[in-house]
Amino acid sequence: VELLKSSPATVRRDIVRLEEEGEVERYWGGIRRKETPENRRRNTLQSQEPDEAHAAIGRLAASRLHDNELIFIGSGTTTLEMIPYIQNSNIHVITNGIPQLEALHRKKIQALLLCGFFKEYSRSMVGKETVEMLRGYHFDQAFLGANGINDNLCLLSADEYEDEIKKLCILQSKSTYLMVGKEKFHRTAYYSVPGEISGEVTIITDYPEYQSPQWIEENGAYMCKISRLLGND
Protein backbone atom coordinates (compact mmCIF):
# COMPACT_ATOMS: atom_id res chain seq x y z
CA VAL A 1 0.00 0.00 0.00
CA GLU A 2 2.85 2.39 0.85
CA LEU A 3 4.63 1.62 -2.43
CA LEU A 4 1.45 2.16 -4.43
CA LYS A 5 0.60 5.34 -2.48
CA SER A 6 -3.04 4.22 -2.35
CA SER A 7 -5.46 3.29 0.40
CA PRO A 8 -6.18 -0.40 1.16
CA ALA A 9 -9.75 0.10 -0.11
CA THR A 10 -8.49 1.46 -3.44
CA VAL A 11 -6.03 -1.42 -3.85
CA ARG A 12 -8.76 -4.00 -3.09
CA ARG A 13 -11.14 -2.33 -5.55
CA ASP A 14 -8.49 -2.32 -8.29
CA ILE A 15 -7.68 -5.98 -7.68
CA VAL A 16 -11.36 -6.94 -7.92
CA ARG A 17 -11.70 -4.97 -11.17
CA LEU A 18 -8.59 -6.57 -12.70
CA GLU A 19 -9.82 -10.01 -11.64
CA GLU A 20 -13.23 -9.38 -13.22
CA GLU A 21 -11.53 -8.26 -16.44
CA GLY A 22 -9.49 -11.47 -16.49
CA GLU A 23 -6.14 -9.69 -16.16
CA VAL A 24 -5.08 -11.24 -12.85
CA GLU A 25 -5.86 -14.25 -10.69
CA ARG A 26 -5.63 -14.55 -6.93
CA TYR A 27 -3.61 -17.10 -5.02
CA TRP A 28 -2.82 -17.54 -1.34
CA GLY A 29 -0.92 -14.44 -0.29
CA GLY A 30 -1.15 -12.37 -3.46
CA ILE A 31 -2.16 -11.98 -7.10
CA ARG A 32 -0.44 -12.71 -10.38
CA ARG A 33 -1.03 -11.80 -13.98
CA LYS A 34 -3.33 -14.30 -15.67
CA GLU A 35 -1.99 -16.11 -18.71
CA THR A 36 -4.28 -15.31 -21.65
CA PRO A 37 -4.13 -15.95 -25.40
CA GLU A 38 -3.36 -12.24 -25.89
CA ASN A 39 -0.43 -12.38 -23.46
CA ARG A 40 0.89 -15.51 -25.14
CA ARG A 41 0.53 -13.81 -28.54
CA ARG A 42 2.54 -10.81 -27.35
CA ASN A 43 5.28 -13.01 -25.92
CA THR A 44 5.42 -15.03 -29.14
CA LEU A 45 5.69 -11.89 -31.26
CA GLN A 46 8.50 -10.55 -29.12
CA SER A 47 10.51 -13.77 -29.29
CA GLN A 48 10.27 -14.18 -33.06
CA GLU A 49 13.32 -13.64 -35.22
CA PRO A 50 13.19 -10.23 -36.94
CA ASP A 51 12.46 -10.12 -40.67
CA GLU A 52 14.51 -8.36 -43.33
CA ALA A 53 12.11 -5.40 -43.50
CA HIS A 54 12.63 -4.57 -39.84
CA ALA A 55 16.36 -5.18 -40.21
CA ALA A 56 16.42 -2.56 -42.99
CA ILE A 57 14.68 -0.11 -40.65
CA GLY A 58 17.31 -0.86 -38.02
CA ARG A 59 20.21 -0.32 -40.43
CA LEU A 60 18.90 3.04 -41.57
CA ALA A 61 18.28 4.18 -37.99
CA ALA A 62 21.79 3.18 -36.90
CA SER A 63 23.29 5.09 -39.83
CA ARG A 64 21.94 8.35 -38.38
CA LEU A 65 24.17 8.16 -35.29
CA HIS A 66 27.29 10.26 -34.73
CA ASP A 67 30.14 9.99 -32.25
CA ASN A 68 29.82 11.51 -28.78
CA GLU A 69 26.03 11.87 -28.95
CA LEU A 70 23.54 11.30 -26.14
CA ILE A 71 20.85 9.01 -27.55
CA PHE A 72 17.49 7.73 -26.34
CA ILE A 73 16.35 4.33 -27.62
CA GLY A 74 12.80 3.44 -26.64
CA SER A 75 11.45 0.01 -25.84
CA GLY A 76 9.96 -2.32 -28.46
CA THR A 77 11.04 -4.92 -30.97
CA THR A 78 11.65 -2.51 -33.86
CA THR A 79 13.98 -0.17 -31.96
CA LEU A 80 15.89 -3.24 -30.80
CA GLU A 81 16.69 -3.90 -34.46
CA MET A 82 19.02 -0.91 -34.76
CA ILE A 83 21.45 -1.98 -32.04
CA PRO A 84 23.32 -4.74 -33.96
CA TYR A 85 24.10 -2.16 -36.69
CA ILE A 86 25.48 0.56 -34.42
CA GLN A 87 29.09 1.31 -35.36
CA ASN A 88 29.62 4.20 -32.93
CA SER A 89 30.88 2.68 -29.68
CA ASN A 90 31.56 6.08 -28.07
CA ILE A 91 27.93 7.19 -27.82
CA HIS A 92 25.90 7.29 -24.60
CA VAL A 93 22.45 5.72 -24.58
CA ILE A 94 19.48 6.11 -22.26
CA THR A 95 16.72 3.50 -22.59
CA ASN A 96 13.64 2.21 -20.82
CA GLY A 97 13.85 -1.18 -22.54
CA ILE A 98 15.56 -4.10 -20.82
CA PRO A 99 16.29 -6.00 -24.09
CA GLN A 100 17.82 -2.78 -25.44
CA LEU A 101 20.04 -2.47 -22.37
CA GLU A 102 21.20 -6.08 -22.74
CA ALA A 103 21.95 -5.67 -26.46
CA LEU A 104 23.87 -2.44 -25.85
CA HIS A 105 25.89 -4.12 -23.11
CA ARG A 106 26.87 -6.90 -25.53
CA LYS A 107 28.09 -4.20 -27.94
CA LYS A 108 30.07 -2.58 -25.08
CA ILE A 109 28.12 0.67 -25.51
CA GLN A 110 27.56 2.79 -22.42
CA ALA A 111 23.89 2.63 -21.50
CA LEU A 112 21.64 3.60 -18.62
CA LEU A 113 18.26 2.03 -17.84
CA LEU A 114 15.57 4.38 -16.56
CA CYS A 115 13.87 3.35 -13.33
CA GLY A 116 10.13 2.81 -12.90
CA PHE A 117 7.54 0.04 -12.89
CA PHE A 118 8.33 -3.12 -14.87
CA LYS A 119 5.96 -3.62 -17.80
CA GLU A 120 6.06 -7.34 -18.44
CA TYR A 121 4.92 -7.83 -22.03
CA SER A 122 7.30 -5.19 -23.44
CA ARG A 123 10.01 -5.79 -20.81
CA SER A 124 10.25 -2.05 -20.26
CA MET A 125 10.28 0.47 -17.43
CA VAL A 126 7.36 2.91 -17.29
CA GLY A 127 5.54 5.18 -14.85
CA LYS A 128 5.88 8.54 -13.12
CA GLU A 129 9.42 7.78 -11.93
CA THR A 130 10.47 6.97 -15.49
CA VAL A 131 9.07 10.23 -16.82
CA GLU A 132 10.61 12.30 -14.01
CA MET A 133 14.02 10.73 -14.59
CA LEU A 134 13.67 11.36 -18.33
CA ARG A 135 13.08 15.07 -17.70
CA GLY A 136 16.71 15.38 -16.62
CA TYR A 137 18.06 14.59 -20.10
CA HIS A 138 18.25 16.46 -23.40
CA PHE A 139 19.12 14.18 -26.29
CA ASP A 140 20.91 14.67 -29.57
CA GLN A 141 18.66 12.01 -31.09
CA ALA A 142 15.80 9.78 -29.97
CA PHE A 143 14.62 6.56 -31.60
CA LEU A 144 11.10 5.43 -30.76
CA GLY A 145 8.71 2.65 -31.63
CA ALA A 146 4.93 3.08 -31.63
CA ASN A 147 1.69 1.18 -31.28
CA GLY A 148 0.84 2.63 -34.65
CA ILE A 149 0.23 5.78 -36.70
CA ASN A 150 -3.25 7.09 -37.41
CA ASP A 151 -4.54 8.63 -40.63
CA ASN A 152 -3.49 12.09 -39.42
CA LEU A 153 0.07 10.80 -38.98
CA CYS A 154 -0.06 11.12 -35.19
CA LEU A 155 1.96 8.67 -33.10
CA LEU A 156 -0.17 6.18 -31.14
CA SER A 157 0.59 4.58 -27.78
CA ALA A 158 -0.83 1.57 -25.99
CA ASP A 159 -1.19 3.41 -22.67
CA GLU A 160 -0.65 6.73 -20.92
CA TYR A 161 2.84 5.77 -19.72
CA GLU A 162 4.18 5.15 -23.23
CA ASP A 163 2.39 8.28 -24.43
CA GLU A 164 4.13 10.49 -21.85
CA ILE A 165 7.53 9.02 -22.66
CA LYS A 166 7.07 9.66 -26.40
CA LYS A 167 5.94 13.27 -25.92
CA LEU A 168 8.81 14.06 -23.58
CA CYS A 169 11.44 12.44 -25.81
CA ILE A 170 10.26 14.40 -28.84
CA LEU A 171 10.28 17.68 -26.92
CA GLN A 172 13.72 17.07 -25.41
CA SER A 173 15.54 15.74 -28.47
CA LYS A 174 17.16 17.67 -31.31
CA SER A 175 16.02 14.94 -33.72
CA THR A 176 13.47 12.16 -33.21
CA TYR A 177 12.97 9.10 -35.39
CA LEU A 178 9.94 6.83 -35.33
CA MET A 179 10.80 3.28 -36.36
CA VAL A 180 7.69 1.49 -37.67
CA GLY A 181 6.89 -1.26 -40.14
CA LYS A 182 4.25 -0.73 -42.82
CA GLU A 183 1.78 -2.77 -40.77
CA LYS A 184 1.63 0.05 -38.19
CA PHE A 185 -0.02 2.63 -40.50
CA HIS A 186 -3.76 3.50 -40.46
CA ARG A 187 -4.31 2.37 -36.88
CA THR A 188 -6.37 3.82 -34.04
CA ALA A 189 -5.69 4.03 -30.32
CA TYR A 190 -6.91 5.96 -27.31
CA TYR A 191 -3.58 7.67 -26.72
CA SER A 192 -2.01 9.76 -29.47
CA VAL A 193 0.75 12.36 -29.57
CA PRO A 194 -0.71 15.70 -30.78
CA GLY A 195 -0.07 16.63 -34.40
CA GLU A 196 2.03 19.70 -33.59
CA ILE A 197 4.45 17.42 -31.72
CA SER A 198 4.24 14.43 -34.08
CA GLY A 199 5.07 16.68 -37.04
CA GLU A 200 8.63 17.11 -35.78
CA VAL A 201 9.27 13.37 -36.00
CA THR A 202 10.96 11.60 -38.91
CA ILE A 203 9.47 8.23 -39.86
CA ILE A 204 11.77 5.35 -40.75
CA THR A 205 9.83 2.52 -42.36
CA ASP A 206 10.14 -0.33 -44.85
CA TYR A 207 7.49 1.04 -47.23
CA PRO A 208 6.54 4.64 -48.18
CA GLU A 209 2.87 4.28 -47.27
CA TYR A 210 1.94 7.87 -48.17
CA GLN A 211 2.75 8.94 -51.72
CA SER A 212 5.20 11.82 -51.57
CA PRO A 213 8.40 12.85 -53.35
CA GLN A 214 9.77 13.71 -49.91
CA TRP A 215 10.66 10.11 -49.05
CA ILE A 216 14.40 9.38 -48.97
CA GLU A 217 15.44 5.79 -49.60
CA GLU A 218 18.58 4.45 -47.94
CA ASN A 219 19.76 0.97 -47.05
CA GLY A 220 16.50 -0.62 -48.21
CA ALA A 221 14.30 1.56 -45.98
CA TYR A 222 12.61 4.94 -46.29
CA MET A 223 12.52 8.06 -44.15
CA CYS A 224 10.66 11.35 -44.19
CA LYS A 225 9.71 14.02 -41.67
CA ILE A 226 5.99 13.84 -40.84
CA SER A 227 5.45 17.57 -41.38
CA ARG A 228 6.69 17.17 -44.97
CA LEU A 229 4.23 14.36 -45.63
CA LEU A 230 1.50 16.66 -44.36
CA GLY A 231 2.71 19.47 -46.64
CA ASN A 232 3.65 21.74 -43.74
CA ASP A 233 7.32 22.17 -44.72
Residues covered by each model-derived region:
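Residues at secondary-structure transition points
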Residues: 48-52, 56, 77, 95, ...
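A generic structural-conservation signal
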Residues: 27-28, 95, 113, 225
